[in-house]
Amino acid sequence: MKSSSTADIKVGAAIHNWVVANNGGSDVIRLDRRTNLWGIVKQNLDTLPNDYHIIQDRSEYIAVELLDVRQHKTYNRTADREIYINELYRCYISEAGQAAIRRYLENQIRAAFRVYMISRYSDGQDEQIRHAIGSFLSDFDLPINNQIIARLSKDWYRYRQKNIEKYEIPIFF
């Protein structure tokens, strides 16, 4: 099924750059019905507010393609009760939904960072850890500044302290 519209989500510049780097230069995410992100998007679809304006500066925004969800689903609770969601009218993601999607993408970046660091980690010297963090930021076109490096190194040190015995890369089948 083809999707017909997109919804804009404010995620911040760093997440925008990460999505563009992982998505072949595009800031539009194409979803599958079986993903967690589609579940979050579908829960938070809403009608356009009256004060909605078209976004000119897209440096902090990504777009999510809305799948065709024009279908009837009958549930066993009450007879003849159907849910009908049409993305023609529900093409806006609420503020709470945008925050949930931003948190989900932040967790995905954090998981990708930890897997990257586990694969690059050798003996744990501070200079090598900072170099690995810098190469992660440059590989995913994220801005390199002291605040982000300090935040990621703090996250890595806490993760390493908590999971000192588990330095394997997870493999999913």
PLM feature spans:
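Short, charged amphipathic recognition helices of the HTH superfamily
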Residues: 120-140
